[in-house]
């Protein structure tokens, strides 16, 4: 017969009573009323927040965007093929967050910061809100350090500073992405973290960018966020904010970062698609009323932080595609008004062989001149003036048959300056070499060289400076100005090369 010990049984019962958890878990559950086109109408989610993540039966995640009297309009962040009318939906109580960390460098991720490059999982050190607040007035500092793009025309006449928002705008196939990629490649020696966000692009284009960065040794300090053209509109809409969250992680660690949004026209189109399907009232060009806020809250996250916060920075290079050069359309005017200047790329210049096809006349940098190095300022002022005069004379000379010698000389110099500013794709030039090249152009050293040989002379000068006069480059790097001694040395080099 088994010996039953009542005290042991009572102890076990007592322990079970004590360990019994009386806490009730309350789930906010709703039902799918309607599903289609990446939009779900959900009934019964009474306690849901705007922007809250929702979980559907098939594990698809959605975002609650429209909170209406009798239902909630949610956008899906996936195909949602397993969602049916009547399926259950659970609110998560969370706002969209993405993992961030140093391990993301050199990787290609999707809009939710999940790896898509086949190199395995990415260990994340923390998470950040996709839609986080932009730095306030007190936490910012004015732009004071340069971001060198390696493109002579930009670094001299449209300078960009750390923490600036500089728009790259132009028609399709005018070299907008090339300008951004050259800027990323040029950060190799600058200790700058780069984030490239591809929105609504062909997967082949993104693969091309990845291989270019890899070939140039720039992928190691770059993160690529890709929301390809075949992905749901929600993921194309959210991709820039994910890129900004990844860049902010480094910015708040005191690092300088550059983020490229390629391009915001496609993000606005994705947002328009979502808004119209959610039956929000359309405005100008059928965009919703808050499309300005869509871009302003994104671009305001770019900043140069105060020294108290580590002095980090996020420089934003948004790209906008225009139709037939029309910068007065809705989205271009919005983004021009938000940013601190724009680089305008012209299809006519591109087709006439001037590459990068920068229209210097209507391109501007509103705050970058404060960050420009003294050496560049010494030569850039005259370059801008001479090119402006040349543009005016060139237009005038088309109607005049006989021109005096001074005008002809000015036109000849202008043609050579324009030739001097042409540059190959993916081959950025250091700022020290740029100073020497511009000095040669504005001081007449190219005037007697045939136009077809200007490029060759520029290459010869760069090669000579690197191999035979490294003291000139190191002196400008340390002093940041063109001293009288350096000027004499440069004059001697230019005279020798011409002779």
Swiss-Prot record:
It is found in: Plastid, Chloroplast thylakoid membrane. GO terms for molecular function: ADP binding; ATP binding; proton-transporting ATP synthase activity, rotational mechanism. ATP binds at residues 170-177. It is an enzyme of class 7 (translocase). It is a peripheral membrane protein. Disulfide bonds: none annotated. The keyword ATP-binding applies. It catalyses: ATP + H2O + 4 H(+)(in) = ADP + phosphate + 5 H(+)(out). One of its GO terms (cellular component) is chloroplast thylakoid membrane. It holds the Pfam family ATP-synt_ab_C. Its EC number is 7.1.2.2. It comes from the Eukaryota. InterPro entries: ATP_synth_asu-like_sf, ATP_synth_asu_C, ATP_synth_asu_C_sf, ATP_synth_F1_a_nt-bd_dom, ATP_synth_F1_asu, ATPase_a/bsu_AS, ATPase_F1/V1/A1_a/bsu_N, ATPase_F1/V1/A1_a/bsu_N_sf. Keywords: ATP synthesis, ATP-binding, CF(1), Chloroplast, Hydrogen ion transport, Ion transport, Membrane, Nucleotide-binding, Plastid, Thylakoid, Translocase, Transport. The record marks 363 as: Required for activity. Produces ATP from ADP in the presence of a proton gradient across the membrane. The alpha chain is a regulatory subunit. Belongs to the ATPase alpha/beta chains family. NCBIfam families: atpA, PRK13343.1. F-type ATPases have 2 components, CF(1) - the catalytic core - and CF(0) - the membrane proton channel. CF(1) has five subunits: alpha(3), beta(3), gamma(1), delta(1), epsilon(1). CF(0) has four main subunits: a, b, b' and c. This is ATP synthase subunit alpha, chloroplastic. It comes from Emiliania huxleyi (Coccolithophore). The lineage of its organism: Eukaryota, Haptista, Haptophyta, Prymnesiophyceae, Isochrysidales.
């Amino acid at each position: 017969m088994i010996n039953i010990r009542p005290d042991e049984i009572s102890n076990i019962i007592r322990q079970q009573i004590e360990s019994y958890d009386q806490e009730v878990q309350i789930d906010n559950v709703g039902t799918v009323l309607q599903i289609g086109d990446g939009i779900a109408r959900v009934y019964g989610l009474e306690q849901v927040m705007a922007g809250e993540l929702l979980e559907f039966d098939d594990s698809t995640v959605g975002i609650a965007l429209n909170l209406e009297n009798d239902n909630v309009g949610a956008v899906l962040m996936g195909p949602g093929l397993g969602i049916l009318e009547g399926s259950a939906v659970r609110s998560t109580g969370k706002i969209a967050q993405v993992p961030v960390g140093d391990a993301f460098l050199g990787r290609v991720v999707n809009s939710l910061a999940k790896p898509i490059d086949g190199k395995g999982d990415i260990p994340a050190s923390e998470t950040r809100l996709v839609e986080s607040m932009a730095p306030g007035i007190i936490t910012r500092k004015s732009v004071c350090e340069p971001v060198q793009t390696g493109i002579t025309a930009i670094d001299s006449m449209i300078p960009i500073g750390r923490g600036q928002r500089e728009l790259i705008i132009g028609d399709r196939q005018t070299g907008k992405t090339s300008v951004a990629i050259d800027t990323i490649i040029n950060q190799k020696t600058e200790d700058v973290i780069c984030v490239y966000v591809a929105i609504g692009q062909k997967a082949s284009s993104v693969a091309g960018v990845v291989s270019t960065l890899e070939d140039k040794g720039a992928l190691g300090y770059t993160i690529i966020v890709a929301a390809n053209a075949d992905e749901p509109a929600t993921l194309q809409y959210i991709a820039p904010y994910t890129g900004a969250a990844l860049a902010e992680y480094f910015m708040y660690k005191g690092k300088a970062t550059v983020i490229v949004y390629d391009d915001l026209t496609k993000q606005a189109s994705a947002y328009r698609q979502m808004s119209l399907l959610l039956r929000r009232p359309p405005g100008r060009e059928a965009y919703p009323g808050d499309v300005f806020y869509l871009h302003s809250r994104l671009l305001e996250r770019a900043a140069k932080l105060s020294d108290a916060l580590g002095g980090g920075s996020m420089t934003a290079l948004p790209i906008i595609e225009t139709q037939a050069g029309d910068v007065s359309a809705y989205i271009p005017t919005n983004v021009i008004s938000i940013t601190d200047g724009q680089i305008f790329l012209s299809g006519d210049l591109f087709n006439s062989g001037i590459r990068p096809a920068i229209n210097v006349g209507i391109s501007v940098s509103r705050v970058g001149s404060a960050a420009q190095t003294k050496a560049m300022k010494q030569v850039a002022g005259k370059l801008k003036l001479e090119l402006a005069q040349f543009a005016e004379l060139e237009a005038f000379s088309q109607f005049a048959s006989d021109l005096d010698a001074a005008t002809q000389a000015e036109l000849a110099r202008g043609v050579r300056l324009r030739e001097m500013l042409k540059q190959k794709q993916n081959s950025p030039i250091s700022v020290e070499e740029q100073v020497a090249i511009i000095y040669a152009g504005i001081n007449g050293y190219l005037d007697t060289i045939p136009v077809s040989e200007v490029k060759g002379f520029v290459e010869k000068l760069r090669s000579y400076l690197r191999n035979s006069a490294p003291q000139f480059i190191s002196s400008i790097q340390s002093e940041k100005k063109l001293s009288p001694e350096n000027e004499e040395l440069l004059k001697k080099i230019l005279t020798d090369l011409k002779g």
